[in-house]
């Protein structure tokens, strides 16, 4: 394809970083999800399995295409539980969206194996785990297609932006058509009209050159950003391992964790709430520009039962699309709290804390001291 400037250079550099042949920059992570699912041909009469812990855009991208999202419970990695996933597969299941949440890779290998064995597509949502890996293999390379987000809160950002990556040329060309004018392009950048499968309705998700230039610089910075966060997190985490009363999130591969978030889980929701308030009193507090230390029940549209449009099955149009479509008549459409009991319990008993890339050792000491004081008071000897 003819060189388009900063955006295409970023696409080539990001693809090389992941070890994949194709990357397509788009205007947002949500746009990346919509583009990926559109390229896969998702539509009415199909079901897509999604985790109970994700971002609202995951289910929105499925619903907007006329398919039905099916919830799967999570495990102690805070990713999809492979055993529960198997129980959610029906004859209508078309694919799985596996989400690497809160900075660390989920247990993706058994999910990928299930997808292969059942003939399902696998989309990796890497929006919160850019730079993560499992035994050296980067997230985003285990499935058929993956998406990334470069929104303002991400470890690599252009304010807004996203990317679709794949090793499948046909899928890439369909994604190009979706994100652009509805047609793919040849190697010279000219629109292709002769292949009916590549003639779709375009969405206009193109990324602009300014953000492409920013992302090229950010990509070069990302390894040190991830290293700083990981070093801070695991210094804190090592200290917390010695404290009573908490359980740390299971990390599939600590060397591949981006270090962006630290999740701690307690015996009961009441204890979690009290510890959260006590940590805030010690100065580990939320701040206007972002997340510092909150109970996971405050984590908004990342929790399935907080997505009101999903719970109420809100329609795209007045005719009830997609819920009332005859193609979707036999699909289960239940999303109330209680559908995913493991997730419900973890959300109620856990605290999530962000780990900035700019923490000093004195900041890490303050966090460790606050946890030590609070945990020994509530869960151990107050000495």
Regions found by a protein language model. Give the residues of each.
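Proline-centric
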Residues: 73, 352-360
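Conserved PLP cofactor-binding pocket of PLP-dependent enzymes
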Residues: 183-193, 235-240, 276-350, 379-383
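PLP-dependent aminotransferase-like
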Residues: 38-126, 133
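Active-site region of PLP-dependent enzymes
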Residues: 129-135, 142-261
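Phosphate-binding glycine-rich loop
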Residues: 2-47, 61-65, 71, 137
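Short, conserved charged micro-motifs
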Residues: 269-275, 360-365
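Basic phosphate/pyrophosphate-binding loop/patch that engages nucleotide-derived ligands
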Residues: 113-121, 163-181, 274-283
């Amino acid at each position: 394809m003819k060189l388009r400037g900063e955006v295409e250079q970023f696409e080539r550099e990001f693809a090389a970083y992941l070890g994949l042949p194709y990357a397509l920059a788009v205007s947002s992570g949500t746009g990346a999800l919509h583009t990926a699912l559109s390229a896969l041909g998702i539509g009415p009469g199909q079901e897509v399995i999604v985790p109970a812990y994700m971002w609202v855009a995951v289910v929105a991208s499925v619903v907007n295409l006329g398919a039905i999202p099916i919830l799967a419970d999570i495990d102690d990695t805070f990713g999809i539980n492979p055993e529960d996933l198997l129980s959610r597969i029906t004859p209508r299941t078309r694919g799985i969206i596996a989400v690497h949440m809160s900075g660390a890779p989920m247990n993706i290998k058994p999910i990928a194996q299930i997808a292969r064995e059942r003939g399902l597509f696998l989309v990796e949502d890497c929006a919160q785990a850019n730079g993560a890996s499992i035994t050296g293999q980067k997230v985003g390379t285990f499935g058929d297609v993956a998406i990334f987000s470069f929104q303002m809160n991400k470890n690599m950002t252009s304010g807004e932006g996203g990317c679709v990556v794949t090793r499948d040329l046909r899928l890439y060309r369909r994604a190009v058509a979706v994100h652009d004018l509805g047609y793919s392009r040849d190697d010279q950048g000219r629109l292709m009209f002769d292949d009916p499968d590549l003639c779709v309705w375009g969405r206009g998700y193109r990324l602009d050159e300014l953000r492409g230039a920013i992302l090229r610089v950010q990509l070069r910075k990302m390894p040190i950003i991830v290293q700083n966060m990981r070093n801070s997190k695991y210094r804190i985490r090592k200290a917390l391992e010695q404290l009573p009363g908490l359980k740390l999130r299971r990390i599939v591969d600590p060397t591949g964790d981006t270090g962006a978030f630290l999740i701690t889980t307690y015996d009961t929701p009441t204890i979690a709430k009290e510890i959260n308030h006590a940590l805030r009193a010690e100065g580990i507090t939320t701040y206007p520009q972002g997340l510092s230390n909150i109970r996971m029940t405050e984590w908004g549209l990342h929790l399935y039962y907080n997505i009101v449009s999903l719970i109420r099955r809100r329609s795209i149009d007045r005719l009830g699309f997609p819920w009332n479509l005859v193609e979707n008549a036999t699909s289960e459409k239940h999303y109330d709290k209680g559908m995913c009991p493991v997730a419900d319990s973890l959300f109620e008993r856990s605290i999530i804390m962000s780990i900035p890339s700019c923490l000093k050792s004195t900041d890490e000491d303050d966090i460790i001291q606050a946890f030590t004081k609070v945990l020994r008071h509530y869960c151990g000897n107050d000495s």
